[in-house]
């Protein structure tokens, strides 16, 4: 199973986990890291590395961050290893739900593709969708 680590500003990572588990049930191999404005960033980087080790069963780990270019994303990118530890910025609930359903069977490349597609698919302006635009 592909491991997941949510790395976000404030408590958003934990709230995403709660929302995901509300929809699809408890998740194994999932960890959260919250980055605060006064945190020691090297300590948080070590926390990310420890979380990656904890959730990694050999199929890889996806680090999901809230915003590309933000501190959580930059810290996640600093531990990235292409093909083994990947970073997806701009996490949303549809993306997490998709990953929960595919990470047990898909390889890393396919899971990343499906997560990105699902995340994009569910970003909509409701009035445009409802009017058929």
Predicted regions and their residues:
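N-terminal loops that bind phosphate or other acidic moieties
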Residues: 2-133
